[in-house]
Design a protein with these regions (language model features):
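Enriched for short, Lys/Arg-rich terminal
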Residues: 2-7, 11-26, 40, 56-60, ...
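A short, surface-exposed loop/turn module that caps and links secondary-structure elements
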Residues: 31-55
């Protein structure tokens, strides 16, 4: 299986600066691991969304889209579990 390219939306990238440092490295590692396996154990598909998933990193969530045809993962949002689902 080919490695997926990872693209992080600017707003998600900015959110990393507001997250406490001990969690940032875990979040970055989880995102990097998506390149090898876009459907890791524990990932959940969003209901009503075609290719949108979420993974947990402690109390934080990473919301991302998988584009199998482009071999691309697009990270849409990163945030605390109480805030991340609000649009």
């Amino acid at each position: 299986m080919a490695k997926y390219r990872i693209e992080v939306v600017r707003s998600a990238e900015k959110t990393l600066f507001s997250i406490p440092k001990p969690f940032v490295s875990k979040i970055i590692k989880a995102i990097e691991n998506l390149a090898d396996n876009p459907y890791p154990a524990g990932c959940r598909k969003f209901v009503g969304q075609k290719d949108t998933f979420r993974i947990r990193v402690n109390v934080y969530r990473i919301i991302y889209e998988v584009h199998d045809d482009l071999i691309l993962i697009k990270v849409l949002k990163i945030g605390h579990r109480k805030d991340v689902y609000r649009y």
